[in-house]
A protein has these predicted regions:
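Long, positively charged, glycine-interspersed low-complexity recognition regions
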Residues: 4-5, 118
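S-adenosyl-L-methionine-dependent methyltransferase catalytic module, highlighting the catalytic core
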Residues: 5-10, 14-17, 126-140, 144-258
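Class I SAM-dependent methyltransferase Rossmann-like catalytic core
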Residues: 8-47
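Short, contiguous strand/loop micro-motifs
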Residues: 30-31, 58, 182-184
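A conditional alpha-helix N-cap/helix-loop micro-motif detector
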Residues: 33-37, 63-64, 189
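Amphipathic alpha-helical segments that form well-ordered structural scaffolds
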Residues: 43, 47, 73, 195-203
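Conserved SAM-binding loop
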Residues: 45-158, 248-256
């Protein structure tokens, strides 16, 4: 379980190793806010040990795009870090012990894994039952699948689902400064808690943990708009409500054969 103390420790390691600290991390620390990436990274820090065989599905060029140092620590800590991705981006990932270019359905390794992670991958999956069946095949009995993805009914996701695909990169480039080769078609078939429970449950997984992660990053490139997001988040949290923009983080343990 990730604690506030653990998050703060990793926050300092992530943002305060190089001085001066940027205005955005300082602002988030002032508000006591940790973004979804921070929480995902801290969660994996609690799950990865020296005997962990880890498969990162859809890994691309980065295990943690915003935290290479932490990704390197976990890559050195685990026994195996294997990456799987049909994109050529996987060739640029320097931390993988093993890399496989292809789809999860066609992946036939000689081992099973203690942990399989899907970081911002679930929203692109067009065949959820097929993917879940492959995850059950790849995961050891008692092993975990960690799914970190966007929420289907968040404002940005709704707009994205209505917009033509060519517009996705234009918006992502403007707001998050991403590269075109990191933009892929979206499906949003595994992007609610109910859908994840149903799909993963049918494949023999039980939900071990689940969190809605408030996401105040839509306008984080600009100080004023980021401040407005954080103020709004603080007000909503004070009355027990989530911020409208959220991500999903679910951990699913393989407990039985698929139904």
């Amino acid at each position: 379980m990730v604690t506030q103390e653990h998050l703060l420790e990793l926050f300092r390691h992530k943002y305060e190793q190089t001085l001066p600290v940027g205005w955005s991390p300082l602002l988030r620390r002032k508000f006591g806010y940790f973004n979804p990436d921070d929480i995902y990274e801290a969660t994996l820090d609690t799950l990865v040990g020296p005997e962990t065989d880890w498969l990162d599905v859809g890994c691309g060029r980065d295990v943690f795009p915003s935290n290479f140092a932490m990704a390197k620590i976990l890559a050195q800590r685990c026994r195996i870090l294997a990456g799987l991705d049909p994109s050529d981006n996987i060739d640029e990932n320097p931390l993988l012990h093993e890399r496989y270019k292809g789809t999860i359905e066609s992946f036939q390794p000689k081992r099973q894994f203690d942990m399989v992670t899907l970081r911002m991958v679930a929203e692109h999956i067009s065949d959820p039952p097929g993917t879940a069946a492959a995850l059950a095949r790849l995961c050891k009995p008692g092993g975990r699948v960690v799914i970190y993805t966007v929420y289907k009914w968040s404002p940005v996701t709704i707009v994205s689902s209505l917009a033509p695909f060519w517009l996705h990169h234009v918006v992502k480039k403007r707001i998050w400064n991403t590269e075109e080769k990191d933009t892929f078609p979206t499906e949003y078939r595994m992007n609610t808690r109910r859908d994840l429970r149903r799909i993963m449950g049918a494949a023999g997984f039980e939900e071990e943990r689940f969190s809605y992660l408030d996401d105040c990053r839509s306008f984080a490139r600009w100080k004023l708009t980021n401040l407005m997001e954080l103020v709004g988040w603080k007000v909503l949290r004070s009355i027990g409500l989530h911020y409208p923009e959220v991500c999903l983080l679910g951990i699913y343990r393989r407990s039985r054969p698929a139904s």
